[in-house]
A protein has these predicted regions:
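Hydrophobic transmembrane helix segments
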Residues: 12-46, 53
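Membrane-water interface at the C-terminal end of transmembrane alpha helices
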Residues: 112-134
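Cytosolic juxtamembrane helix and N-cap/initiation of the first transmembrane helix
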Residues: 1-15
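Membrane-embedded alpha-helical transmembrane segments of multi-pass integral membrane proteins
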Residues: 12-22, 57-61, 80-90, 109-119
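Juxtamembrane helix-break-helix junctions at the cytosolic face
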Residues: 56-75
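Transmembrane helix-loop junctions in multipass membrane proteins, especially transporters and channels
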Residues: 24, 28-31, 70, 93-100, ...
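Membrane-helix boundary connector in multi-pass membrane proteins
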Residues: 73, 86-106
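Membrane-interface loop-to-helix entry segments
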Residues: 52, 105-112
Length: 134
């Protein structure tokens, strides 16, 4: 189960990265980025720090999923998964302009992976949690 959860976090990181890479091909996007903003949102130090924390979490969850004891592992995955879903919902209200189809496709895949992470962690066999936490 630990390896499976770690693999889901790795897949999620790839989706985040490729989604951002594809956005560079949108007309005018690179110009906005070099001017310090995107879709009406200006890049301040707090915004970029928040983005760094947000993007560091899946990488840390790969490590934590592989190394934490079962009980801690289970809750770390549930909490991190819910947090990322809330962020995904929150991003629907940020920015200006139309969202491109590829972006929505990646968001759907991200949501599916996050729900699967939560489901796997939630359904972690209870007898194994009791046995492995001793």
């Amino acid at each position: 189960m630990k390896v499976k959860l770690a693999l889901f976090w790795i897949a999620l990181m790839f989706l985040y990265i490729y989604n951002d890479i594809l956005s560079l091909y949108q007309p005018g996007h690179v110009a906005e980025l070099t001017e310090g903003h995107s879709q009406g949102m200006y890049f301040t130090q707090p915004i970029l720090f928040g983005a760094a924390v947000l993007m560091a979490l899946p990488g840390l969850m790969v490590l934590l999923s592989a190394t934490l004891k079962v009980r801690s592992n289970r809750w770390a995955n549930i909490i991190a998964g819910i947090f990322h879903i809330l962020v995904l919902i929150g991003t629907q209200f940020i920015g200006e302009g139309d969202t491109w189809l590829y972006w929505r496709f990646y968001e759907l895949l991200e949501l599916i992976l996050l729900l699967q992470i939560i489901r796997l962690a939630w359904r972690w066999p209870q007898h194994r949690i009791l046995m492995m936490s001793k």
